[in-house]
Amino acid sequence: MTESHDLGPIGDRVLFEDEQIRVWEMVLEPGERSPMHHHTHDYIVVVVEGDHVTVEPLEAGSKSAPVVPGHSVFLRKGGTEVAVNSGAVRYRDVQIELLDS
């Protein structure tokens, strides 16, 4: 990660937090981009709404994929990226950070 990038939060708002987990919500309208952000903890993403999302890592390239509401995925800490709603409908997810990771 380079220091020349201003980093934002991994989501729009914190829904819950205790000493073990922090739960975020992220909402992106079609074409909207999240701020560049860095994942400092392992986390689980649960898709709530949406049909397609693109992730643009700081390092280079992008990964685009269809998403299905209700689907969840575990991801390791360390990524620095921008999320883009590349779909036709609103994208919303819940991210659960594992604070002891």
Locations of the language-model features?
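Glycine- and acidic-residue-biased ligand/ion/polar-headgroup-sensing regions
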Residues: 40-59
